[in-house]
């Protein structure tokens, strides 16, 4: 039986259409899901939408829509963007579904039966945007939210139900000590630990005077807090379509989740509240939470007030899915903050994909049509000496790329693959097969061309989780009918295609065509100072 790997993005809040940060998270999750599928794993990749809460209620009211109609429209927008970005998720979890309601009620009952929910008085400053109470020490000048800096917080004084988070302080510290990789990168782990060590306070899990949400099972006059509800969307997504919606059915195959991928703004919910809730319900904790940074544009924080937001729909429509996927995976070290510059975007894509990779394939194919009758040279890859410069680099890549993906070091995978592509260009220039062909050195020419074509194939395979359409096009020009989208052919599974010497001798090649057209900067960007 194939091993399992389950991963999630956050369930995105549907106050507005997806922004570039949501796209960034989901691209990374899709890349990892594709890698594990190629490794032969059964994968459950979960994304979806978080659809309850006061913010949704207010936004829908402002738009003249019912909350459900608003949620349906925005959820469809997320699904449309994921399709444009070639995101192959397995489950799209919506927290307004009746099946989710059943899971939430059962989970609540477990926590209630464990004595971890009680009625208390809640006073404090509340950010509607975050759907969260803020401590006084966190607030910016003018009682503004530290995350939504243009929003002032509201004073709340109400009687709510609380979860005994403080009860799990030591259990959380013990878990972090026993599982040092539970939250990564280390800077984020240290941030969570510091917060826990300062002392945890019980948090409210219900709201009054809020219609848009699930009622508290033990008190229908109150509504469950959006985060208590939303986090359980990861569990609901594990149900098979035919399953009765129970925790036992949801958890029987895919739990615990191997990896949650989140942004740093929701770290406390995932790194503190969520594991404590699971402990209370007697459920295993996720294996790992990986936290990425924020994106800026041209070195500035993005925001509507600054007029510098980056529309992911427009970006994909202009440049294509693979271009967007490649830039963010290669240029932003996952786990750190990153920047988008359209000038750099175009420069990187032209240099890496059009020149280093695309041009190498194109020129080598043209020579193969001219010198080896339009076929892969009649050379056995295994017979190429191990000290051959391209084989050495290729075998190093095949041995290290998997670790790069598993550690979410996508930028390193891209750099290693590019190193081989650039070496292929250098090797071709130095060996000058056109000169050696004229000198009658046909065997040497065949070996040169084989080594370059095999290097390009390996680069395409290694980068397939990031640029699946381009990798498929490269394989097609090398004479394969292999697909990297949809169902995966058995020939692609495992590491077989990651080895040196896979390209069959004498395989007919396709006519050379550019795989990636050079990009042009829009005039408005090109003319800006």
Curated annotation (Swiss-Prot):
Its main location: cytoplasm. The keyword Nucleotide-binding applies. InterPro entries: Anticodon_Met (IPR041872), Met-tRNA_synth (IPR014758), Met-tRNA_synth_2 (IPR023457), Methionyl/Leucyl_tRNA_Synth (IPR015413), MetRS_core (IPR033911), Rossmann-like_a/b/a_fold (IPR014729), tRNA-synt_1_cat_dom (IPR032678), tRNAsynth_Ia_anticodon-bd (IPR009080). ATP binds at residue 304. Binds 1 zinc ion per subunit. SUPFAM superfamilies: Anticodon-binding domain of a subclass of class I aminoacyl-tRNA synthetases, Nucleotidylyl transferase. GO terms for cellular component: cytoplasm. A motif ('KMSKS' region) lies at residues 301-305. It comes from the Bacteria. It is found in: Cytoplasm. Is required not only for elongation of protein synthesis but also for the initiation of all mRNA translation through initiator tRNA(fMet) aminoacylation. This is Methionine--tRNA ligase. It comes from Thermosynechococcus vestitus (strain NIES-2133 / IAM M-273 / BP-1).
């Amino acid at each position: 039986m194939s091993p399992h790997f389950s991963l999630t993005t956050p369930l995105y809040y549907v106050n507005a259409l997806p922004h570039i940060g949501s796209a960034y998270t989901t691209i990374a999750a899709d890349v990892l899901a594709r890698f594990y599928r190629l490794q032969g794993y059964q994968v459950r990749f979960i994304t979806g939408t978080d659809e309850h809460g006061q913010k949704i209620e207010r936004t829908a009211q402002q738009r003249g829509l019912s909350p459900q109609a608003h949620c349906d429209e925005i959820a469809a927008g997320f699904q449309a963007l994921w399709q444009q970005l070639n995101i192959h998720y397995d489950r799209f979890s919506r927290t307004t579904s009746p099946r989710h309601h059943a899971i939430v009620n059962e989970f609540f009952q477990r926590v209630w039966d464990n004595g971890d929910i009680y009625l208390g008085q809640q006073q404090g400053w509340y950010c509607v945007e975050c759907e969260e109470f803020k401590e006084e020490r966190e607030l910016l000048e003018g009682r503004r939210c530290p995350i939504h800096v243009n929003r002032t917080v509201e004073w709340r004084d109400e009687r709510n139900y609380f979860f005994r988070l403080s009860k799990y302080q030591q259990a959380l510290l013990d878990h972090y000590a026993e599982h040092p990789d539970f939250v990564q990168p280390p800077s984020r782990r240290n941030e969570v630990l510091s917060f826990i060590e300062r002392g945890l306070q019980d948090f409210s899990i219900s709201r009054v005077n809020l219609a848009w949400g699930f009622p508290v099972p033990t008190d229908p006059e109150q509504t469950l807090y959006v985060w208590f509800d939303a986090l359980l969307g990861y569990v609901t997504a594990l149900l098979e379509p035919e399953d009765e919606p129970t925790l036992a059915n949801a958890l029987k195959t895919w739990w615990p989740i191997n990896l949650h991928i989140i942004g740093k703004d929701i770290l406390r919910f995932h790194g503190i509240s969520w594991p404590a809730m699971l402990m209370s319900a007697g459920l295993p904790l996720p294996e790992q939470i990986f936290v990425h940074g924020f994106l800026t544009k041209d070195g500035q924080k993005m925001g509507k007030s600054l007029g510098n937001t980056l529309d992911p729909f427009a970006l994909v429509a202009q440049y294509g899915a693979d271009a967007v996927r490649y830039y963010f995976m290669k240029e932003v070290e996952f786990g750190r903050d990153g920047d988008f510059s359209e000038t750099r975007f175009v420069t990187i894509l032209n240099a890496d994909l059009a020149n280093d990779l695309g041009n190498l394939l194109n020129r080598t194919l043209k020579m193969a049509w001219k010198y080896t009758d339009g076929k892969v040279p009649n050379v056995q890859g295994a017979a190429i000496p191990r000290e051959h410069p391209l084989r050495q680099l290729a075998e190093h890549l095949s041995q290290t790329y998997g670790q790069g993906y598993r550690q979410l070091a996508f930028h390193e995978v891209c750099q290693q693959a590019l190193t081989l592509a650039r070496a292929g260009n250098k090797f071709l220039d130095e060996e000058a097969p056109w000169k050696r062909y004229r000198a009658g050195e046909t065997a040497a020419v065949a070996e040169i061309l084989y080594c370059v074509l095999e290097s390009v194939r390996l680069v395409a395979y290694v980068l397939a989780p990031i640029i699946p359409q381009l990798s498929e096009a490269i394989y097609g020009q090398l004479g394969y009918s292999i697909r990297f989208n949809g169902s995966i052919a058995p020939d692609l599974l495992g590491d077989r295609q990651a080895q040196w010497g896979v390209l069959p001798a004498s395989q007919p090649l396709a006519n050379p065509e550019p795989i990636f057209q050079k990009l042009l900067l829009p005039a408005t960007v090109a003319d800006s100072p």
